[in-house]
């Protein structure tokens, strides 16, 4: 099975990607991870990418695509893979089609995990992290026994910048603007399937399997 996984930040994409990777014995390929790996291992592509990253610039498509191509040509991708974080644009999607054609492969399905924005906002802006031990809490779903204090070590709980309401709203706006054309692109190709994210992880997994036609 060759899958592309779409989903807004906070939609629970990472958890489902891990599950699907284990269930189907296919590698979970996160573009962020393979980019960092190439930089760390000082590969030719990694060195090129690092020049941009060091300047705080986005790594150009042609480098990202080469890195993805290199990863997809590895032995463990022969029977399938799960792509997460790529493609992000129509240009990248078209480039991916070409890469797969060269490798004699094609995408089976594009899975979009949909969660209403207000639900994501509640999930993310309610998160609190312990400054001392890193334990995670949630003001609604997993509140600490004493407000602002970690149950584990008694450390102070704080809200990460990334989880502040305004930041989350901005990230969601950017995500929708960027991803909608991609959703339309794969819908037109008849590859798009949708799973509706639920409160419980296990219920989302059921939705995901149903969307993929696996009960």
From Swiss-Prot:
One of its GO terms (molecular function) is adenylate kinase activity. GO terms for biological process: AMP salvage. It catalyses: AMP + ATP = 2 ADP. PROSITE patterns: ADENYLATE_KINASE. AMP binds at residues 31, 36, 57-59, 85-88, 92, 160, 171. It is found in: Cytoplasm. Residues 30-59 are annotated as: NMP. Pfam families: ADK, ADK_lid. It is an enzyme of class 2 (transferase). Keywords: ATP-binding, Cytoplasm, Kinase, Metal-binding, Nucleotide biosynthesis, Nucleotide-binding, Transferase, Zinc. Its EC number is 2.7.4.3. GO terms for cellular component: cytoplasm. Residues 126-163 are annotated as: LID. PANTHER family: NUCLEOTIDE KINASE (PTHR23359). NCBIfam families: adk (TIGR01351), PRK00279.1-1 (NF001379), PRK00279.1-2 (NF001380), PRK00279.1-3 (NF001381), PRK14527.1 (NF011100). Monomer. HAMAP family: Adenylate_kinase_Adk (MF_00235). Belongs to the adenylate kinase family. Consists of three domains, a large central CORE domain and two small peripheral domains, NMPbind and LID, which undergo movements during catalysis. The LID domain closes over the site of phosphoryl transfer upon ATP binding. Assembling and dissambling the active center during each catalytic cycle provides an effective means to prevent ATP hydrolysis. Some bacteria have evolved a zinc-coordinating structure that stabilizes the LID domain. This is Adenylate kinase. It comes from Caldicellulosiruptor bescii (strain ATCC BAA-1888 / DSM 6725 / KCTC 15123 / Z-1320) (Anaerocellum thermophilum).
């Amino acid at each position: 099975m060759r899958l592309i996984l779409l989903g807004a930040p906070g939609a629970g994409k990472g958890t489902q990607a891990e599950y699907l990777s284990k269930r189907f014995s296919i590698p979970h390929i996160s573009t962020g991870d393979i980019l960092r790996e190439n930089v760390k291992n000082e590969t030719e592509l990694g060195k090129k990418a690092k020049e941009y990253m060091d300047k705080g610039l986005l790594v150009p498509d042609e480098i990202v695509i080469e890195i993805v191509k290199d990863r997809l040509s590895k032995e463990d991708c022969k029977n399938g893979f799960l792509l997460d974080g790529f493609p992000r644009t129509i240009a990248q999607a078209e480039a991916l089609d070409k890469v797969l054609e060269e490798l004699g492969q094609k995408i089976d399905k594009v899975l979009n995990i949909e969660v209403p924005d207000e639900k994501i906002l509640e999930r993310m802006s309610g998160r609190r992290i312990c400054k001392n031990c890193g334990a995670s809490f949630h003001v609604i779903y997993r509140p600490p026994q004493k407000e602002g204090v970690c149950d584990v070590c008694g450390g102070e709980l704080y809200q990460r910048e990334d989880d502040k309401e305004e930041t989350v709203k901005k990230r969601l706006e950017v995500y929708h603007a960027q991803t909608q054309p991609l959703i339309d692109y794969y819908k037109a190709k008849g590859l798009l399937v949708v799973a509706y994210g639920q409160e419980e992880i296990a219920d989302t997994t059921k939705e995901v399997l149903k969307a993929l036609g696996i009960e």
